[in-house]
Amino acid sequence: MSAARRKEKRMSVLNGLEPKSVFKFFEDISAIPRGSGNTKAVSDYLAEFARVRGLEHYQDELNNIIIIAPATEGYENAEPVIIQGHMDMVCEKAPDCAKDMEKEGLDLAVEGDVVFARGTTLGADDGIAVAMALAVLDSKELPHPRVEAVITVDEEVGMDGAMGIDLSPLKGKMLINIDSEDEGIFTVSCAGGAHVECTLPAAREDFDGQALDIAVTGLLGGHSGAEIDKGRANANMLMGRLLYALGKATEFRLVSVRGGLKDNAIPTASYAAVIVSDADAAKAVCAEMEAQFKDEYRVNDGAICVSVSAGERAPALDKAATEKAVCMLVCMPNGIQAMSADIAGLVQTSLNLGILTTREDAVCASFSVRSSVASQKRMLIDRLECLTAQLGGTVSISGDYPGWAYRQDSPLRDLMAEVFTEQYSHAPTIAAIHAGLECGLFLGKKPELDCVSLGPDIDEIHTFREKLHIASTQRTWALLTETLKRMK
């Protein structure tokens, strides 16, 4: 089958759906492989879209693109508006799917009220934002102020595009981000964050005693932003408590301690290799601590298990290094540190000890620090630096990105809420998330921005079961276009 015939076949899948232009552009970009890190082709498609229409545009070396449409008649003096989303998608597929997502487009399908891709992720996160932005830019009938479409790359793997983009071509101070997956919810704040690694130097020595392996397992874990408020245990922190109790019962040396794979995930298990003077006392401590943990977390994390078994002898951390490692685990803050004063139930500030490792000469603890208030994030980083310095260690900070603080005064939020209420006969839900969004990075570059994030209903993003709801897309498009119309 020729490439032209394949494209024709793809185009026929969504051809009857409304809004026609939105689904046309969604189908166009769905024919282009656009996983994170593989965005050159789709970026070039967007640049060609702009070139053919004579639209001002900027494409950078990262493949980010800005496309600008001038104001329509009567809107020349209106404030410009930014429409923003990301072009990359998460590429996941069913176990029996043979598609090469690096080279092949998606096989779209419609069933009832949903669009999906056969065997793979759909990429409505965030292809629907790209499609809506293009539909606005392409329209000859839609009234609007100057529209500045900002379409970034690699949001799904660290927001690298938003970090690197130059926003100097933009005149707009209002930004509509179309990267939310729940219709009727306006996100108006998000957390900033940083990765903080605390490293304690460690000398080793021979220590007489019995080698034991201790494991804390069975925890639920979860995302350290979205699920930090669920009252679940952190396996690394529990291991710190256990080791401190062990030191009260018998002399011991730590050989290694490890737990967790990602600093933005609450660790479900933690493991320590130790050499103890009194094995029976150590086993009694493990049994006692298991009972304590089960009781404390019986509602939110009730399957915690502490096991102990014979280990292999190896050179251990010396007494000072063992004590400092345990002290770090006991004294470092973890979990929720502050709740929002503006939005009920929202976590404002938190941190998570997500990765714990031991090298030959060091013990390392990696934290994910989050806050929607920049000074609170800095305060937590300062605490980690101070505690680590007192223990003779060093701290490295990476991936520092700004948050998006809630604005009491938001003309964009007020306008969109007014339009929403008229269309839906009820007010939107005003929400915030304790995780990062590109809006936070843009605010770091342009603090004057007034942002709202919204989107149509998308189910099971980042899985091959992802589905975009058609009717929800229609309503979201109507909300967007009416908002633009009222910006005169």
PLM feature spans:
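A short beta-alpha structural unit
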Residues: E27-A31, G260-K262, Y271-A272, C305-A316, ...
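Fold-level recognition of mixed alpha/beta catalytic cores in primary-metabolism enzymes, strongest
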Residues: H144-A235, G247
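Acidic/His- and Gly-rich active-site-bordering loop/insert found
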Residues: K7-K9, V13-V114
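Acidic-enriched catalytic cores of C-N bond-cleaving enzymes acting on peptides and small amides
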Residues: E205-G209, I228-R258, I275-S350, A389
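Active-site-adjacent substrate-binding region
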Residues: N234-M237, R241-V257, Y406-L449
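Active-site metal-coordination/substrate-binding segment of hydrolases
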Residues: Y75-V157, A162-K173, H195, D208-A211, ...
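Zn-dependent metallopeptidase/amidohydrolase metal-coordination segment
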Residues: P19-V22, A341, Q348-V363, S368, ...
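His/Asp/Glu-rich mid-to-C-terminal helical/loop segments that flank catalytic regions of hydrolases
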Residues: S168, R232-A249, D278-A279, K324-V330, ...
